[in-house]
Design a protein with these regions (language model features):
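Extracellular acidic, Ser/Thr/Pro-rich low-complexity tracts
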Residues: 40, 49-59, 69-71, 128
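Conserved structural position at the C-terminal beta-strand
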Residues: 124-126
Length: 149
């Protein structure tokens, strides 16, 4: 008779020990770069707006955008800027401390007037509250004013 009670007690303890713990979020955020279009063309001194839609299944934590010159790519240098051109690199960051699952990133970008002509890489990264990270990549060309396609 005691064995029935012990069995019932053990079964109850077993069921209580099974918690409803939420599973760990392993889903990476998603990024859709809306602008500039991949392989866009700009001139040194131009400005444009970086637009990207960030989303996560639970909560976004932060974002980062980086632009850097691709020194190995094809470039068009004009003789008047060859000595003064700089390999352009810039970075922007933002914290999303709330519990946002969606965020429209809108970041104005100004290309320096003395930016090196050639291909630049654009990297947009998103991090969620659990530490999952993802990145989206695109490129654009900084051209000389007199460049023709």
């Amino acid at each position: 008779m005691y064995s029935k009670y012990i069995l019932a007690l053990l079964t109850g303890l077993f069921l209580l020990s099974c918690s409803d713990d939420e599973s760990t979020d392993t889903t990476r955020p998603e990024i859709e770069v809306l602008a500039p279009a991949d392989h866009s063309h700009f001139h040194a001194g131009d400005s444009f707006e970086l637009r990207a839609q960030l989303s996560d299944n639970e909560a976004l934590a932060s974002w980062k955008a980086n632009i850097h010159f691709n020194g190995d790519g094809h470039t068009h240098k004009s003789s008047s800027t060859e000595d003064t051109a700089v390999e352009w690199e810039a970075e922007w960051t933002g914290d999303l401390a709330g519990s946002e699952t969606s965020f429209l990133l809108e970041q104005p970008i100004e290309i320096p007037a003395n930016a090196e002509h050639g291909e630049c890489h654009l990297v947009v990264m998103a991090l969620d509250r659990q530490g999952n990270e993802t990145a989206a990549y695109s490129s654009f060309e900084v051209e000389a004013e007199d460049h023709q396609h």
